[in-house]
Amino acid sequence: LCIQSHLNLSIGQETSIDAFSNVEIKTPRKNIKARGKNQQEYIKKIYSKELVFGVGPAGTGKTFLAVAAAVDALLNERVNRLVLIRPAVEAGEKLGFLPGDLSQKVDPYLRPLYDALYEMLGMERVNKLLEKEIIEVAPLAYLRGRTLNNCFIIMDESQNTTKDQMKMVLTRMGYGSKAVINGDLTQIDLPKNITSGLSHVLNVMNEVKEIGVTEFNSSDVCLLYTSPSPRDQRG
């Protein structure tokens, strides 16, 4: 069952965070349970809003919970595709200076997203979905001019987008799409004279009711709980 049917909720319906306190997101290989107020709030916002920002340090469950919600949405046919985005500029590296084709260049930057998908769906199934472009890897530079309809979009490490790049991602969202934008404002690898797109958009849009923002902290690290799905007891 998807999380909405489990809770008898619908997208856009307001509910208390307490309603999410013991909820598991069920995926074929793992059941994922949010722990702590911030993770529960984050899950609530992902399921009730079209655009959500998760901000905070690594290890707080931002990526894993977003991928779990995306897998749930895909398997329950609320979206047609998953689109994975991660800035390919980190610690001074750019795509053009990395060896290999586009897929090989982008894949290392998406490893945390792939790892989460493999845990929930298995490597073979993920690879088949990638081949069919049901799961799509979308480098920022290749989003220009596109409209992403009926997609669940996840952008990781968004602190390393520029203002223009962040605007481009947000304006790619089309009909029936949802986006979760994650980042850590203490880990910006952009040149010092360039403003982080994440920092900028949070300052501009933080009070917009239709947008969800969850701020994580060190107390959220390692709180995430997973258990094998009854459908997959292979360990």
Model-based region annotation:
Residues 1-18:
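Interdomain "pre-motor" coupling segment immediately N-terminal to P-loop NTPase/helicase cores
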Residues 37-45:
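Pre-Walker A adenine-sensing motif
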Residues 61:
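Conserved glycine(s) of the Walker
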Residues 64-129, 193-207:
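Conserved P-loop
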Residues 88, 93-99, 161, 165-199:
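Conserved P-loop NTPase nucleotide-binding/switch module
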Residues 135-152, 162-166:
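Conserved RecA-like ASCE ATPase "motif II neighborhood" in helicase/translocase motors
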